Amino acid sequence: MGWHVAKVGDRWAALEPIRQGMTLAFGSIAPKVALGVALRHDWGTQYTANTFVNEIKCWGFTDTPAFVGEPECNGCAERFMRTLKEQCLYLHQFRDLEEARAIIGAFIAQYNAEWIVERLGYRTPAQARREALREAA
């Protein structure tokens, strides 16, 4: 999965990190490239929009919205967003979108490389991903 900073959080903005993730994981954005991959999201309007639903279906994702009223279904993502807000967003007043992208990008890179996460067995996200990919191979 990628990340994206935009002024408007619409369905187009919601699709961008998915495009980034597909390119990184599969080398391209193409129909059915993500077959077998489940995409968990909440019930925000950007994720329920026909454009969003049709795009992820075309790419082969299994659409798995979180259960209404049960944020723990999406707990890892929700916890990361809380950390991002508390450790990055609330500490800065960005001059513009470019500065926001630079600072947020640096935080995400540091988080993935250095942040020890209990849920991941006290490993960094990068370590957990490498080990998961190695086990899947």
Language model: regions and residue ranges:
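Charged DNA-binding/catalytic regions of mobile-element recombinases
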Residues: 1-137
